[in-house]
Amino acid sequence: MTTMFDAAVIGAGPAGSAIATLLARAGWSVALVEQQAFPRRKVCGECVAASNFALLDALGVGPEFAERAGAELRRVALMRGDETIVAPLPAAAGAHPFGRALGREYLDTLLVAAAEAAGATRWQPWSLQAISGSAGRFVLRVRRDETAEEAELGAALVVAAHGSWQPLPSERDERRDARTVGDLFAFKANFRGATLAGDLLPVLSFPGGYGGMVVADDGVLTLAGCLRADRLRALRAAHPGLRAGDAFEALLRNECRGVADALDVATREGAWLASGPLRPGVRVDAGDGVFRIGNAAGEAHPIVGEGISMALQSAFVLAALIAPARAELTAPASAASVQRSAQREHTRLWRRRFARRLAVAAAFAHVAMRPAPAAAAWPLVRRWPGILTAGARWSDKTRCAPEAARLVAAFA
C-alpha cells in the first residue's frame, strides 16, 4: 500500500525540517524522511549567524534557541602556527546582531519537532532506498533498518535536503567514482573545560586543511576541521596506533598553538566524529526532477561557517516560491510542466543568493590550507586585521536572502 503526500522531504536537518514546517503550514501534506534517530551529534561547526534568528522565530524555535545557545560571537580570530590575530565580527541588523552556536543534537531536534507540530508526517528513523517516477507521481521506497520494515510513499514533489554525507541512491556510484587525493574529510569533537573566550570565533589555518573552534551551549567547545585525503593518509601512517580523529587532534595541537592553549586543561566529551569526503560546489539543478536545498543544492567550504545559514535560508527561498502554488505543482495534469518551470526559477534564485558565498568560501579555504598563499597573506592580515571583519561580511554573515526575509515578514 502506498501512502500519498503532496511533498516528500529527504533529510530532517535544518533545511529539511524548515521546508517541511513551511509547506505543512501552507496546507501541504508532507512526509519528512530521516534515516538517523534524534538527538544525535553531527560533524558541523554549529554556528548560527544572527541573520537567521528571525527565521528560527518564524519556525517557532527561536525562544528555545536563545535560551540554550552559547554566548554572542563578537570577535573572529585567525590562528596559524604560534600566532593569533583577532578582529571584530560585523554586526547584523536587529536587536540581536551577533551569531551564536548550538549543538546539532539540540538544534535539529528542535526543528524536526517543529515540523511535526506543523503537520508534517515524520518518518524517522527510516532510510531512503530508491526513488522512481517523475513530477506528480514520484514513488519512494523507505526502510526502517532496525526492524527491516519497508514502506512505499507517493509524492507529487520531492525535496532533497540530505546534506553532504548521505547522497541519494542515484548519486552513490558517482560519488565513489569521483574520489581524489584532494578530497577533504571532516572531523569534529566536543570538549569541556576549554579556556577559549565565549565571544571568540577562531579560524584555524594549517597545511592541507583548515578548521575552527566555538563555545556552544553549556560551555561546551566544538572543535571541527577538514583535512585533505593525502595529508590524512600521511598522518595515519605517522601515527599507526591512533584513530583518525585522535591523529587529527594531535595535528591541530601541534600546528596551531591557539588550539593547544584552548584545550590545555579540557577533557573531550565523546568520540571524534568523522565524515566525508566533502563535495563543495553547486548541485542545485541535477536534472532529475528533484528540488534541492541546503548542502544537497550546493556546499560551501565550511571555513566560513555558513552551512546552517544556507540550509535555513535556502529552505525559506524554496518555500516562498512553491508553497503558494500547491494545486498547480501537485496536480497530475500540470505537475510536470509547472515543476520544470519552478525548478528553473529556483535554480536562478539559488545561484543569485548563494553562489557568491561558495566562491568566497573556496577562496578563503584554498589560502588557508596552502602554505605559500597562507604565508603570503599572513603579513597583510597581521597589519590590517580588519581584513577578517571584511571577510566575514563578504561571506554574507550579516545578510539574509530577501525571499526568506519577506516570508518571515508574512508570518509576522
Describe the function of each predicted region:
Residues A320-A412:
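C-terminal helical "tail/cap" subdomain of flavin- and related membrane-associated enzymes
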Residues A24-C44:
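Glycine-rich FAD pyrophosphate-binding loop
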Residues R233, A238-I322, R326:
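FAD/FMN-dependent oxidoreductases across multiple families
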Residues A114-D261:
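Predominantly flavin-linked oxidoreductase catalytic cores and closely associated redox partners
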Residues A15, F38, W165:
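Conserved Rossmann-like nucleotide-cofactor binding loop
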Residues A37-D57:
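Conserved N-terminal glycine-rich FAD pyrophosphate-binding loop of Rossmann-like flavoproteins
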Residues T2-A15:
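Beta1/beta-strand and adjacent pyrophosphate-binding region of the FAD-binding site
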Residues F53, D57-T109:
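A conserved beta-strand/loop capping segment in the N-terminal third of enzymes
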